[in-house]
Amino acid sequence: MAERGLEPSPAAVAALPPEVRAQLAELELELSEGDITQKGYEKKRSKLLSPYSPQTQETDSIGQKERNQTPAPTAAQTSAPSKYHRSRSGGARDERYRSDIHTEAVQAALAKHKEQKMALPMPTKRRSTFVQSPADACTPPDTSSASEDEGSLRRQAALSAALQQSLQNAESWINRSIQGSSTSSSASSTLSHGEVKGTSGSLADVFANTRIENVSAPPDVTATTSSSSSSLRPANIDLPPSGIVKGMHKGSNRSSLMDTADGVPVNSRVSTKIQQLLNTLKRPKRPPLKEFFVDDSEEIVEGIPQPDPNQPKPEGRQMTPVKGEPLGVICNWPPALESALQRWGSTQAKCPCLTGLDVTGKPVYTLTYGKLWSRSLKLAYTLLNKLGTKNEPVLKPGDRVALVYPNNDPVMFMVAFYGCLLAEVIPVPIEVPLTRKDAGGQQIGFLLGSCGIALALTSEICLKGLPKTQNGEIVQFKGWPRLKWVVTDSKYLSKPPKDWQPHISPAGTEPAYIEYKTSKEGSVMGVTVSRLAMLSQCQALSQACNYSEGETVVNVLDFKKDAGLWHGMFANVMNKMHTISVPYSVMKTCPLSWVQRVHAHKAKVALVKCRDLHWAMMAHRDQRDVSLSSLRMLIVTDGANPWSVSSCDAFLSLFQSHGLKPEAICPCATSAEAMTVAIRRPGVPGAPLPGRAILSMNGLSYGVIRVNTEDKNSALTVQDVGHVMPGGMMCIVKPDGLPQLCRTDEIGEICVSSRTGGMMYFGLAGVTKNTFEVIPVTSSGSPVGDVPFIRSGLLGFVGPGSLVFVVGKMDGLLMVSGRRHNADDIVATGLAVESIKTVYRGRIAVFSVSVFYDERIVVVAEQRPDASEEDSFQWMSRVLQAIDSIHQVGVYCLALVPANTLPKTPLGGIHISQTKQLFLEGSLHPCNILMCPHTCVTNLPKPRQKQPGVGPASVMVGNLVAGKRIAQAAGRDLGQIEENDLVRKHQFLAEILQWRAQATPDHVLFMLLNAKGTTVCTASCLQLHKRAERIASVLGDKGHLNAGDNVVLLYPPGIELIAAFYGCLYAGCIPVTVRPPHAQNLTATLPTVRMVVDVSKAACVLTTQTLMRLLKSREAAAAVDVKTWPAIIDTDDLPRKRLPQLYKPPTPEMLAYLDFSVSTTGMLTGVKMSHSAVNALCRAIKLQCELYSSRQIAICLDPYCGLGFALWCLCSVYSGHQSVLIPPMELENNLFLWLATVNQYKIRDTFCSYSVMELCTKGLGNQVEVLKTRGINLSCIRTCVVVAEERPRVSLQQSFSKLFKDIGLSPRAVSTTFGSRVNVAICLQGTSGPDPTTVYVDLKSLRHDRVRLVERGAPQSLLLSESGKILPGVKVVIVNPETKGPVGDSHLGEIWVNSPHTASGYYTIYDSETLQADHFNTRLSFGDAAQTLWARTGYLGFVRRTELTAATGERHDALYVVGALDETLELRGLRYHPIDIETSVSRVHRSIAECAVFTWTNLLVVVVELCGSEQEALDLVPLVTNVVLEEHYLIVGVVVVVDPGVVPINSRGEKQRMHLRDSFLADQLDPIYVAYNM
C-alpha cells in the first residue's frame, strides 16, 4: 500500500495471531464492500498491526491524506514505478472531481443502501465478448496494480472471513460469478444464487470462486445447414417447443410469477436471473413527480410530469445588477494592444517575453520583445505582399486565416498571432488535426468554412507531422474546406522594406480574432472578439490582478484560447511581463514541472487548472526543496467548477510548508463568450479567507439556494470566484425562457455587460442575438436599462459581499423530470464510489438523451483492461445506488467501454457530444452495460383498466342508430356461377385424376425443376395415375392397410409426393404430408416428424430410400426412439402391379387428408379436410384465378400444409393447368432460379412464400443489372401471390416490387393470400376485381382494440394492406371475441369465416383441450336470424367498405388482417402484436438481422440476431430499449443478443416465438449477451 510504512510480508501475516488475522480479513471485506472509507480502513488496520510491526520509518501525515492519488497517464512512468505510485485505489483520480467530503458522503449513502441491498441479476456474457484490451493498447493513468502478495493476502482474508460465524456480509457473495475456463455459454455466464442461508452456503460460494467448471456445450439447435456461412438463413425448420408440443393459449395461466416456464425447471440459470430482476422491480419505486400521465381516450398527455407541489421555491427579492469597480484610467495605457508590442519591441528589445520548454521541462527558447516585434512585422509584410501577385493579393485586411500550431510551440504561435494582428487579418486558432476523422473535426471544418478560411498558417515541424496521402499531399480532413498551407518559420519570411510600416489604429469594434467554442450538441461556433474588447480585457485583467512590468508568469493552460491566451499572450505584452509556457506534454512526463518553474524563476503569478494542482501533489515528494513563496497569485481558472474547492484546499495544505500563501489562491470563472466573468483578487496577508457556501443538492436541482440542513451526504460545498471584473456589470437571469432577473436565492445564468466580452458568433446572426444582445427584464416584463448583456453559459448566484459563486455550466445541465442536475456533480459522485480496479478516473462522461418525453441520464466510463466482470458489475450497481441516494435521480444507462476508446478532445479530455452521438447511433461498443429504465421511466401512461363491456345487442343497435353497417364481407356466390365443366360431375379428386388419365393422358400436369433450372421430372395425367396405382397396390400388399388408415408421406418437395398422395386416395388411406427431417440437423427437426407420426396415429410411413436410411440411422437414434417407427415403405422401386379396384368413399363428407402444421406459438395442430372441402377449395381457387388446361403457373413454396399443399398437389389435377414446381431450397443454390423460370416460360401467375420473396429481395438486391444482362424480364407476370397465414408484410412486398420494377415487374402484380388453420384459403387476389387497397391505422388505438384510420405519415401509424380478395363461396364476419357479437364496419374483432371448404375439425390437438370444436362451428350470440355456422380463424382484423366496385358490381368490402390472437402480448392492459415491436427494433441498428419478442412473467424479452461483430452486441441494448419505449410505451425487461439464424423460422417464413422462448428459458441459445434491464 502507498505509505503504509512497512507492508507486512505474507510470512509475517501468517505469523500473526489467528484472531488478528480474522479481524484483518474482516476489515478488508468491509473496505471492499464500502462499509468503511479508505481512511477508516487505514486507521483501524494500523491500530491492529501496531503491536506487531517495527516502528514505521516515515510518518508523513500529509502523504497519508493524499495516498490515493496517482498521476495521469504517462509512458515514462510505466517503466519506473516509484513506491508512492502503488496505491490501493488503482487509479489516477481526475482531480476536478476530488473531494474527501464527497467521497465520505457517497460511502455513507452506499452503506445506508447496503442495509436494503437487492441482488441484481448480473448480465450474461459469452466469453469472447469480454473486453480483451491489450495492455499496450492503452496508456494506463497509473501503474498501481496492487502487489501480488497483497492479492494473495486478500484471498486468504476473504476465506478466513467466511469462516467467521459472524457473517454480516452474506450478500457480498450473492451474484459472484463462477467463471469457468470453458467457452460454453453455461460456463461463461453467471450462476446467481438467492439469498444465502447460513455459513455453509456462503462457504460453498467462496470455494465456487476458485473452482473451474467444465460444462459441455448444449446441442446446437440452430446451425441447420452446413452452408450457413452463406448470407442466407439456415434452412427453415418447423420446431415445436422443447421436444413436446405445447399449446399455450390465453386460457392457460401464463403470468403466474414463477410458473415452471413451460416445462423448463425453474432453477434454470435464466429463470433465476429473471426472478432476481422481478424481485428488484418489486421494490417500491420513488413516486414520480405526478403519479402518471392520464390516458385521455387515446392521447397520452405528452409532456413532462407536473412539478411537485412541495418543491422549494425562491423566496428572496428580485436581484439588482452588480457593478464591478470602475476601470482605472492609466495615462500610459496604449491605444491598442499592437501599440504596446510596438513600444516594447522598439524600446525594450532585450526583455524576455515568452519562454518555451522542451519535453523534459527545460527552457529551450526565449522570445524577446524585440524578436517578437521584428518577426511579427516580417510575417505581416509577407502575408499582405508575398503570397499572391501585386494586383491579386491572396490576403486582404479583414480576411480570416487559421492558425494551426501544436500546444508545445507557444513561440511560433505568438509570432503568427501578432503577425496577423499587424497585417489586420483575423486569426482563428484551432487544434492540430491528428487524423482525417478526428473527434469533432468535422465541426471544426464547418467553422473554417463558415469563416471563409482558405489559408492556414503553421510551422515547418507541424506541417511535416500532418497526416499525408500516398503521394505526400496533406490529406483532405473530413468536412474541411480546401486549405493552402503557409509555413511561418523565419527563413521563409520576407524582410519588409525600410519604408513599410504596419497600420496600427486605435482599438475599435472591428474584429481582432476568433476563438472557437464547442456547444453542448457538438457544433463549433466562432466567438468574434473585437480589438477594443481585446484591449479592454487586458486592462481589466491588469487592474484586477495588479500586474506590473517585468513580472514572471508561469502558464500551464492552453495558450491558444481562454485564460491562457488572455493572460499569457495579451496581458503579458500589455505589461511587458515574461511568460513561461508549460505545455501539456511536459506535464504528462513531469507533473511537477510548473512548480519547479515557479521556484526557479521566482514567478509572481501562475495560471493553472485543478488538474495541475493535483498532479503536482502526486509528484511533490520528488522534490523537497521547491519554494512557492514568490507567488502572489495562483490563478485557478476552473474555479468555476464546483469541485475545485477541495483541490485548492488539498494543494494549500500540502504546499503551505513550501511557502504558498493562503491568500494567493485566486479562483476565477471564464467563458468563451463573456471572457473573464469574475476573479478573486490577490488577498492581503493575514486577512481571513472568504467563506464557503454549503448548499443543498436537492435545492439546487430546483434552482434555488438553500443552506444544506438535511442529510449532509447531499450537500455541495462551493467557493467563490471573487468579484465582477473592473468596469463590468453582472446579473443573474432565468436559464430558460425570457431573460428575467432571478431572485436573490435563485440559481440562474450569469450575464455580464462590459466592453471586455465577445461581440458575436461569426456568421450566425440568430444565435448571436440570443447570447450577445440580451436585455434582462423584471418579473413584470419591463426591460432593465438598455445596456445589452452577454450570456456566460455559467450557472450561479451573487452571494453576500457581491461575491460570485458558480455551481455549474449551462452545457452540463441535465433537465430530468423538471429538475436540473449538473453533469459534473454526477461524475463526482460516480468517482467517489471507490472504483478499486474498475475505471479510469479521468475518463468518464455524463450526458442526457431524450427518451419518451423526458431527458434520461447516461453515464459512460472507460474500464481498466484488468477489471473483472464481477468488479465492474459491483461498481456499476453501487454507482447507481450512490447517484440515486445523493441526487435523487435515476441513471437510465451506465456503460463501460474498453480503455482508450472514448473520443478525445485535443487536450485529452472526453469529447462528450461525440460520445453521445456514438451512443445514439450504436457505435460506442461498450463492454459492460446496465440499463435501469424501470427506475427512471415514471411517466408511462396508466395501465388500461378493462371497462365492463357493452353487450353485443347494444353494440348492434348502436351501429344501426349510427347508420353503420355490420362488418361482413363475402366472395362471389358459387351457386350463381355457371360452369359447363365436366369436372363438376365428379365429387372426388381421385375420380377427376382417373377421368383426366383417360380423356387427356399425355397432358403434362407437373414439371419439377432443379437448381440449374432444368426439368428433372414431369408427370402427365396418365403417368401420375399409373404411379398412384402402383403406390396404392404397395400400401395394400406391403403395408396391409385398410381404408381409413392414416399414412405419413415423407418426401422432399416434388412429384413423388404428389403421386404418393393420390396413391393413398386410391387405396382409401388418409395421407398426412410431413416435411422430411434435415440431415444436418436431426436433433431439431426429427422430433417434429416423430410427433406428427405419433399424433396422427399413422399406420405406415411412405418415403424414399435415402430418407428411410436416415430415419433408422444412429444419428436419428440420438434424437428419437427409432425402434418404434410404424412400418416404413420406400417407393423408389415399385412393382408393376395395380389394385384390382380403386377405393371410392361412400360420401363426400369422408376424410380426404390431414393437414398438420406447427403454429407460430409452437403448437402442432392437425385439421381434417373432407372430400367435399377439397373439391370446394379447388373450385374456388380455379374460379378466382381463372385456371384451365392451357394455363401454366409457377409455384415456389413448401408443399406440406395449408394453401401451399393445395396448390402443389391438388389444384392442377382439378383444373388441368400445368404447374411448374420449384422447391424453395433450390433457391439457396441459385437465387435466380424462380425469376429466371418465370421469365423462361413467360408465366403469368406465380405463387411463393415470404421466405422466397425475402431471399430474392435480400440476395438479388444489388444484382438487378445482372438480371438484365441475363435477359430476365418480369413483364409477363400478371399476379405474383405470396401464400401466408399472417398480416401482409407490406414493406417486404413494396421492396420486392420496387426492386424488380426495373426488369418489368408491374407494381400491381404482387399480392397476398390469407388463410388460417380452420380454413386454408379465405382470401386470394385472383385475376379480376380491384387492386388490393391499403390503409394507415393508428397503433395506439390498435392496442386498445380499436381501429382509427389516419393519414400517411401520421406519427405512430401502421400501414396495412388488404389480404387479396375473398374467395367465391366464402363469407366473413368480424366478431367481438369476448361477447361473440358482430361489430361494425372498420371495427377490430376476430375474423369468423363460413365456407364449403372450411376444415371439418381438429384431428387431435396435442396437449391442449382449450381449442374445442366450437372453433369450427359456432354461432353469433346476436343478430343472425339465419343461425349460420361460423369457424373462428383466431385472427384479429376488420372489414372496411371501399369506394371501389367489386366484380359483382357492388361496392367492394376489403378485409384487413391485423394478426393472430394467440400471438398477441397483453402488457399494461393493452394488446400488442409482436411484429409491431419487432419492426421497430429491426430498424434501430444496421447490425440487427432478425428479431423476436415474447413475454415471460410480465417481462418483455427482446431477442435480436447480431449480424455484425460481437463488439457491437452491447450497442444494441440501449437502442432496443429506447425504441420500444418511444414507440410502444413499454419497458423492455431483458435484451438477448444472439448469433444470426438463432430465431427459429418455419417454412412459411414465420417466427416461432414460443420455441425461442423455451430455448431461452432452458438456456440453449448460447447468447452473445443477455442484459437484464433494472
Curated annotation (Swiss-Prot):
Belongs to the DIP2 family. One of its GO terms (molecular function) is alpha-tubulin binding. The lineage of its organism: Eukaryota, Metazoa, Chordata, Craniata, Vertebrata. Residues 31-166, 178-200, 217-244 are annotated as: Disordered. Residues 91-103 have a biased composition (Basic and acidic residues). Interacts with alpha-tubulin. GO terms for biological process: negative regulation of axon extension; nervous system development; positive regulation of peptidyl-lysine acetylation. Disulfide bonds: none annotated. It is found in: Cell projection, Dendrite; Cell projection, Axon; Perikaryon. Residues 69-82, 154-166, 181-192 have a biased composition (Low complexity). This is Disco-interacting protein 2 homolog B. CDD domains: Dip2. SMART domains: DMAP_binding. Keywords: Cell projection, Neurogenesis, Phosphoprotein. Its main location: other. It comes from Mus musculus (Mouse). It comes from the Eukaryota.
